């Protein structure tokens, strides 16, 4: 979603775009321990997000060769966009927040903000497509059923829409040293320091775009998914009641309860992970004076970190709580371990062979000439 651009991951003007944001710069520094813990947390989320989503994509790719599955196609797209979020949001945001300046150049200033917004949009719209697919599967099983081709078309459309939606960010971001010009600290220390911020023709344009973006990247998808999953839960509850009256198949009733829990968890987790960051962004856009304090950057980083946790939780809900995916994951890990052991064994065998050949060569070289 819209990430406040205190960092490149944000889709908004940073507090650094105004030199007054540095009023506390000389006397206020984030605690070293807090920054260290933040860096460790970012690293853990980055590793878990990439590994979890790569595992899902690998498993789905193998299963897709056996049979085309709409749900798996959409989950793979979600995982791909989540990987982009991990790669393009977490490292740049962490470094920018810790260093308090932008070090990656003007091109990356524009590109990272653009790619981050695109990947975040794709992740959220992928969740919407999954909600639609599950709604049709459970609530309206006799109606229109999305096919694999429909899934691919849907994926193409959300990528195209996300690319177009984020173009204003590509055009508005630039580098500036303005926040460092009026510091009372030695100017030599900050002579080459710059920040990556948005620049709009007017505050009205910036507010209009940022508000529209946060609506499209958070509130509208959340409301849509809430309605879809609410109808799904109601539908499953009615089926559970029928099963109770007929005293049929208790295992099916248990499975439906598990699905209910998972669906509710999906919506709650999505809303909870992104709520702090979007709240921060709304406050910054409309009441930014409230945020001009010592720990502004630290508060932003914590909110951003919580949002990034969603990239780790999505594989959990959409894959690892699925029994079939659990089995496939075990098989994947087994194959990886076996491959590693086989490679090691072959290397040892080749090394031994070379050693034996060397010894043989030495023995031949020392055979007396008269024999």
Curated annotation (Swiss-Prot):
Classification via PROSITE patterns: G_PROTEIN_RECEP_F1_1 (PS00237), G_PROTEIN_RECEP_F1_2 (PS50262)
Residues bearing carbohydrate: 11, 18, 182
Gene3D superfamilies: Rhodopsin 7-helix transmembrane proteins
Disulfide bonding pattern of the chain: 109-196
Extracellular side: 1-31, 94-111, 172-213, 285-297
Subcellular location: Cell membrane
Annotated transmembrane regions: 32-52, 73-93, 112-132, 151-171, 214-234, 264-284, 298-318
One Pfam assignment: 7tm_1
Cytoplasmic side, ranges: 53-72, 133-150, 235-263, 319-371
Tissue note: Expressed in hippocampus, striatum, hypothalamus, cerebellum, small intestine, colon and adrenal gland.
CC annotations in GO: neuron projection; plasma membrane
GO MF annotations in UniProt: neuropeptide binding; neuropeptide Y receptor activity
Keywords: Cell membrane, Disulfide bond, G-protein coupled receptor, Glycoprotein, Lipoprotein, Membrane, Palmitate, Receptor, Transducer, Transmembrane, Transmembrane helix
CDD domains: 7tmA_NPY6R
Function in brief: Receptor for neuropeptide Y and peptide YY. The activity of this receptor is mediated by G proteins that inhibit adenylate cyclase activity.
Entry similarity comment: Belongs to the G-protein coupled receptor 1 family.
The protein's name in its UniProt record: Neuropeptide Y receptor type 6
Lineage: Eukaryota, Metazoa, Chordata, Craniata, Vertebrata
């Amino acid at each position: 979603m819209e990430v406040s651009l205190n960092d490149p991951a944000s889709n908004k003007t940073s507090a650094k775009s105004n030199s007054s944001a540095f009023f506390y710069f000389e006397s206020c520094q984030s605690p070293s321990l807090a920054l260290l813990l933040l860096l460790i947390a970012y690293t853990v989320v980055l590793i878990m997000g990439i590994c979890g989503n790569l595992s899902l994509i690998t498993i789905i790719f193998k299963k897709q060769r056996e049979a085309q599955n709409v749900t798996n196609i959409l989950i793979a797209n979600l995982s791909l966009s989540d990987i982009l979020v991990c790669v393009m949001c977490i490292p740049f945001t962490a470094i920018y927040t810790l260093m308090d300046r932008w070090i990656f150049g003007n091109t990356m200033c524009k590109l990272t903000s653009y790619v981050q917004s695109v990947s975040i949009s794709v992740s959220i719209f992928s969740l919407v497509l999954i909600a639609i697919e599950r709604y049709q599967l459970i609530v309206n099983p006799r109606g229109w059923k999305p096919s694999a081709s429909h899934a691919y078309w849907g994926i193409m459309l959300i990528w195209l829409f996300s690319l177009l939606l984020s173009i204003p960010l590509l055009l508005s971001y630039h580098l500036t040293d303005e926040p460092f010009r009026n510091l009372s600290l030695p100017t030599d220390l900050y002579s080459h320091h710059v920040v990556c911020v948005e620049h709009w023709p007017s505050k009205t344009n910036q507010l209009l775009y940022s508000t529209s973006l946060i609506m499209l990247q958070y509130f509208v998808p959340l409301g849509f998914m809430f309605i879809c999953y609410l109808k799904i839960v109601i539908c499953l509850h009615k089926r559970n009641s029928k099963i109770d009256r007929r005293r049929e198949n208790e295992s099916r009733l248990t499975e439906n309860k598990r699905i209910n829990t998972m669906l509710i968890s999906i919506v709650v987790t999505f809303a909870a992970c992104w709520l702090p960051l979007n709240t921060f962004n709304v406050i910054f856009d409309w009441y930014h004076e409230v945020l001009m304090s010592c720990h502004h950057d630290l508060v932003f980083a914590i909110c951003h970190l919580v949002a990034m946790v969603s990239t780790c939780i999505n594989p959990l809900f959409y894959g690892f709580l699925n029994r079939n995916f659990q089995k496939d994951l075990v098989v994947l890990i087994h194959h990886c371990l076996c491959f590693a052991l086989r490679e090691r064994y072959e290397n040892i065998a080749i090394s031994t062979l070379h050693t034996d050949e060397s010894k043989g060569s030495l023995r031949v070289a020392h055979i007396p000439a008269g024999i």
